[in-house]
């Protein structure tokens, strides 16, 4: 999972790209990068770390131009500690393309082999984003023959070729030297992408493309709409906007985990308020709690900060149980789930959260979290609650059991790492994490909570909950190979302490 942004303006874009990446920081903490286009010259800077730590005044001054893209990285493919695989990526032909991608290709190895053997294109990293960039470059070379002029229609033909050749999830922003900004979304709409406008004094428009609508508010742009599944949009350097459907059979299947955890609560994705979705999840979860736990035994409902707070508040209100804040979050620690490496996650939990004994002593507590993926965090949190004096500790998850690998860009690709990876029951999970009981959202409840807010979205990617992979290419053999590759020891990158 990553965050991407693209901007076409009448003014220099470097500062606004930086501001947009700050608003998308929750989508990736591993690395950040910005690329701009000034005439026919690309400028870029990228490095490991948070946005505020990567960019300095001297870097920003070099990022000249009125058109640019940005990226925050959460590693799912390639080495988590390699600056070489930070984005944007670049190829010099055709024209020169700078590229940023959010998602994960499921046929990257096959496509990579084809690029080498047929198209004679070399891939220098293990990142599937570089593979996708080279497919786009190859298709654009075919769409614009020697002697022909570039056009938005040629760019759309190239995107059609991309859709035919690659599978998986992808939301892309790309700069084409001397031409403009191209953005497109995979035919299933798994990863989010939207755009907005701002009218200048002379009546011209600036365009902003982003993973989440929150950037539109922060940069004072008017949200226009989501990029449709399979659609591509092109904004020329002069601000001319074009769009086209580039997929043969597009379907909308947004990732349910965006609403559960990843996206900011003040974003709206495919017409669904993320905050509203989390409130609805709390209502549906309340029904499950009432069915599995004697409500008279619960003294208070308590969220695990921050993403579970709306669900916990709504659950407490519906069940008429007092709501309390028992954990204080250290806001200088990153999001635990998206930290690379299990060791790092375990180490960070107690640094991230501190329990207040006054809210726990002698009470039966219902802890509400957005999800229980590996169980790493929750096991330690339950222990902290008991150490702080709780008599009983119940746990409720606003997401269903995570039982299957995710192959579309979320860092939980093997069953061996999942606490429910072999179909473990709620009772077995409770024993494992040391809780008195565990209650899960149902898959039906999750889907209903989301469709309640936008009935036009009829399908979601819930593959990590129900094992249904919307791209149709995921087999047992694929998952077995993925798990085997994941379990192989990796050589530490230069500068690694572990």
Each language-model region and where it sits:
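Flexible loop/turn segments at secondary-structure boundaries
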Residues: 12-14, 76-77, 107, 181, ...
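PRPP-dependent phosphoribosyltransferase catalytic core
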Residues: 163, 178-180, 185, 205, ...
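Short, glycine/charge-rich flexible loops or terminal/linker lids adjacent to PRPP-binding catalytic cores
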Residues: 320-365, 376-379, 403-413
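A generic structural motif
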Residues: 31-35, 325-330, 393-399
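Conserved short alpha-helical segments that host acidic/polar catalytic motifs at enzyme active sites
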Residues: 1-229, 234-300, 304, 392
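Extended, hydrophobic alpha-helical segments in both membrane/secreted and soluble proteins
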Residues: 301-304, 308-315, 319, 323, ...
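A conserved beta-strand->alpha-helix junction
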Residues: 55, 130-135, 323-334, 432-450
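Amphipathic alpha-helical
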Residues: 135-153, 305, 313-335
């Amino acid at each position: 999972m990553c965050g991407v942004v693209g901007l076409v303006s009448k003014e220099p874009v470097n500062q606004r790209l930086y501001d947009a990446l700050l608003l998308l920081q929750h989508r990736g903490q591993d690395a950040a990068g910005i690329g701009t286009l000034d005439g026919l010259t690309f400028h870029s800077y990228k490095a490991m770390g948070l946005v505020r730590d990567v960019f300095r005044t001297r870097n920003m001054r070099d990022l000249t131009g009125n058109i640019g893209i940005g990226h925050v990285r959460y590693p799912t493919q390639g080495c988590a500690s390699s600056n070489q695989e930070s984005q944007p990526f670049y190829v010099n032909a055709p024209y020169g393309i700078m590229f940023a991608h959010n998602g994960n290709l499921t046929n990257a190895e096959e496509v990579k082999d084809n690029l080498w053997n047929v198209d004679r294109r070399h891939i220098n990293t293990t990142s599937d984003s570089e593979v996708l960039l080279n497919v786009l470059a190859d298709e654009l070379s075919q769409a614009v023959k020697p002697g022909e002029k570039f056009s938005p229609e040629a760019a759309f033909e190239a995107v059609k070729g991309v859709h035919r050749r690659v599978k998986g999830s992808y939301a892309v922003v790309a700069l084409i030297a001397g031409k403009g900004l191209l953005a497109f979304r995979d035919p299933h709409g798994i990863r989010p992408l939207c755009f907005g406008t701002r009218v200048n004094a002379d009546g011209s428009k600036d365009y902003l493309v982003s993973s989440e609508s929150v950037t539109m508010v922060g940069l004072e742009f008017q949200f226009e709409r989501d990029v449709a599944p399979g659609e591509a949009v092109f904004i020329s350097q002069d601000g001319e906007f074009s769009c086209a459907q580039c997929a043969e059979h597009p379907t909308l299947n947004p990732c349910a985990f965006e609403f559960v955890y990843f996206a900011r609560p003040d974003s709206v994705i495919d017409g669904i308020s993320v905050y509203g979705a989390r409130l609805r999840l709390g209502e549906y979860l309340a029904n499950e709690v009432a069915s599995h736990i004697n409500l008279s035994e619960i003294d208070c409902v308590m969220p695990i900060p921050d993403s579970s707070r709306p669900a916990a508040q709504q659950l407490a209100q519906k069940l008429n149980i007092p709501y309390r804040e028992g954990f204080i979050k250290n806001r200088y620690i990153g999001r635990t789930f998206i930290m690379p490496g299990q060791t790092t996650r375990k180490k960070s939990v107690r640094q991230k959260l501190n329990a207040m004994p006054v809210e726990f002593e002698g009470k039966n507590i219902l802890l509400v979290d957005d999800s229980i993926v590996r169980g790493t965090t929750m096991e330690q949190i339950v222990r902290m609650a008991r150490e702080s004096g709780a008599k009983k500790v119940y746990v409720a998850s606003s997401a269903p059991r995570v039982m299957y690998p995710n192959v579309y860009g979320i860092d939980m690709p093997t069953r061996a790492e999942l606490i429910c990876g072999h179909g473990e029951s709620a009772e077995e999970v409770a024993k494992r994490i040391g809780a008195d009981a565990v209650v899960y959202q149902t898959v039906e409840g999750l889907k209903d909570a989301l469709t309640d807010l936008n009935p036009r979205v009829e399908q979601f990617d819930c593959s990590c909950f129900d094992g249904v992979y919307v791209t149709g290419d995921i087999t047992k053999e694929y998952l077995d190979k993925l798990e085997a590759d994941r379990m192989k020891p990796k050589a530490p990158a230069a500068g690694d302490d572990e």
